[in-house]
């Protein structure tokens, strides 16, 4: 899955740069259409060429009782809360880092590369976190690198707004937060019955999307308040740490206080 998720990182590197040049050449409207046609073509190509690893089996219809079952499991609830909180901090960085770079006076030609730099770091982070997760335990790797993601926000992005610091932060945060993207599904699979992985994944991604949907207005309100950019950064960093802590509690419930347990 780590290898699979690098595809979106590659898109996150190429598309922002291409889109900037397209807007200058053909305007915003046709730039959006061109991107939409590219994505449509790639989706059609994937649907025509991908084959299931196992043949589809006859399955029973999922009932409301089955959909509610995961919410009676403490482990599931803990990781859902953790993912949801982390998404608030994660998307605050992704969406507002370029805006803050502009506000500090960074060269406009350099600002357009902030998100591609973050996604380039994320590409390698997704690969390494997936590989190390298989070797050392997926929960272990997720917890370590996501704690470090929150620490980078508070230790680097919060105190320093120089161009060099913002570029370094975008690369470091991208690398360490890559585990959040690539390990969501593996963490869920590890605590779920095989027959329920499909709809459980849908539930988790739906709930995470609520965080991604609401984080922008919340963060915008923080910036407009007296807290300003510092408030946004503290909010983002604390929620990344809090979200990771819920996943840590889920891990402790499973393994106890065995630090070296592979889980």
What is the meaning of each model-derived region?
Residues 147-161:
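C-terminal ends and interior cores of transmembrane alpha-helices
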Residues 3-54:
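Helix-loop-helix hairpin linking two adjacent transmembrane segments in secondary transporters
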Residues 73-131, 135-139, 185, 215-219:
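Extracytoplasmic gate region of multi-pass secondary transporters
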Residues 14-27, 101-102, 132-136, 214-227:
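Interfacial helix-cap and linker-helix signal at transmembrane-aqueous boundaries
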Residues 21-37, 218-242, 262:
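A membrane-interface helix-boundary motif in multi-pass transporters
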Residues 55-80:
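Juxtamembrane intracellular "pre-TM" segments in multi-pass secondary transporters
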Residues 191-229, 235-236:
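A late C-terminal transmembrane helix in Major Facilitator Superfamily
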Residues 1, 179-193:
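Intracellular juxtamembrane helix-capping segments at the cytosolic ends
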């Amino acid at each position: 899955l780590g290898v699979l998720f690098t595809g979106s990182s590659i898109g996150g590197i190429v598309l922002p740069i291409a889109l900037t040049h397209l807007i200058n050449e053909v305007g915003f409207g046709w730039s959006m259409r061109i991107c939409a046609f590219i994505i449509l073509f790639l989706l059609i190509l994937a649907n025509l060429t991908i084959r299931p690893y196992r043949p589809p089996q006859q399955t029973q219809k999922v009932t409301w009782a089955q959909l509610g079952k995961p919410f009676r499991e403490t482990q599931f609830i803990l990781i859902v809360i953790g993912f949801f909180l982390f998404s608030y901090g994660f998307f605050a960085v992704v969406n507002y880092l370029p805006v803050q770079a502009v506000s500090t006076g960074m060269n406009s030609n350099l600002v357009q590369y902030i998100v591609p730099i973050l996604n380039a770091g994320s590409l390698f982070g997704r690969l390494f976190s997936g590989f190390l997760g298989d070797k050392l335990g997926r929960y272990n790797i997720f917890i370590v690198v996501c704690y470090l993601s929150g620490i980078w926000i508070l230790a680097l992005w919060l105190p320093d707004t120089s161009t060099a610091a913002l570029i370094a932060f975008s690369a470091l945060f991208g690398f360490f937060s890559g585990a959040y993207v690539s390990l969501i599904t593996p963490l869920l699979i590890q605590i779920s019955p095989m027959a329920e992985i499909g709809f459980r994944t849908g539930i988790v991604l739906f709930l995470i999307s609520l965080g991604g949907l609401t984080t922008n207005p919340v963060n915008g309100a923080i910036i407009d308040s007296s807290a300003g950019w510092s408030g946004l950064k503290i909010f983002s960093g604390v929620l990344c740490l809090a979200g990771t802590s819920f996943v840590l509690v889920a891990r402790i419930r499973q393994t106890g206080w065995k630090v070296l347990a592979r889980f």
